[in-house]
Amino acid sequence: FSKTNRPVSGATHDKELPVGKHPIQVYSTATPNGVKVTIMLEELLELGITAAEYDAWLIRIGEGDQFGSGFVKVNPNSKIPAMVDHAPSGEDNGGPLCVFESGSILLYLAEKFGALIPTNIRDRTECINWVMWQMCSGPFVGGGFGHFYAYAPTKMEYPINRYTMETKRQLDVLDKHLANKTYMVGE
């Protein structure tokens, strides 16, 4: 990624994003954050919510697709996943709605379709707590460990050991929470 990452934001080249036949357009790749959106959309479809049909487009992050002008219009942070909903629900008549960051997309889809998120305040808050925990812990652990273990130009013992320990700690949090329950929230 050393050839694509840089210290400033914005597009590096002109390239519009493709648009398919469904209102929901997903722009992503098969990373841990990237697959969250398609997993949720597939779960919504499995529930019989046909309005969750979508088109998925590959963003080749190693080649810098996320820095194309079309992608930057959807997500100014140039990170996957990103989504455009050409038919937002409710009173919104402002045209297509851009949604970025996997957690934000998951919450948007849950709200839009009224599914896969609890409706009572206690369970809903606990659900959002765990979504935020994963959003904050997962990239720190996976991204930090993965970078220093697999991608850093020089292997450094301290960061590898530090992220290994933190990965184990985060998994222990998860194991303890699930020790006597089947699901993160509710049953």
Placement of each model-derived feature along the sequence:
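Surface-exposed helix-capping loop/turn segments at secondary-structure junctions
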Residues: 115, 176-187
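GST-like domain detector, emphasizing the conserved glutathione-binding G-site
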Residues: 1-168
